[in-house]
Amino acid sequence: EATGVHTKFYRFPGGSSTQNTSLSIQNFIDVLKKNHYLYLDWNVISPDINNANATKEQVVTGVMQGVDAYDTAVVLMYDVADKPMTVKALPSIIKQIKAKNYELLPVDESMILIQHNNGNQEEGK
């Protein structure tokens, strides 16, 4: 309401396969479905998420290896102060994606939803 934009998508903190809750994730998924929300996860993780010392080159290489492995890749990246390499790596990642004639698409209802909880990691190439 505050932004005037209505979203239809939800990303679970930690993903739909998270073990960080004592409640069943399926209960949350059922509520989302009942309210016509779609949830999505990721199948590629930027290396700097788990390694604060990752270099720009490591981030680019790690992300591109993941992107190359899937027909549909959803990349988890954080734009936060303690992950500065994400922002620094993005121009190189985008350039490489375009050079390979891959598409950069927004999240929308037509995409293949990557969902950890139902086992959909999307088939590799």
Regions found by a protein language model. Give the residues of each.
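Catalytic domains of cell-wall/extracellular-matrix polysaccharide-remodeling enzymes
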Residues: E1-K98, Y102-E103, D108-I112, H116-N120
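N-terminal secretory targeting signals
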Residues: E122-K125
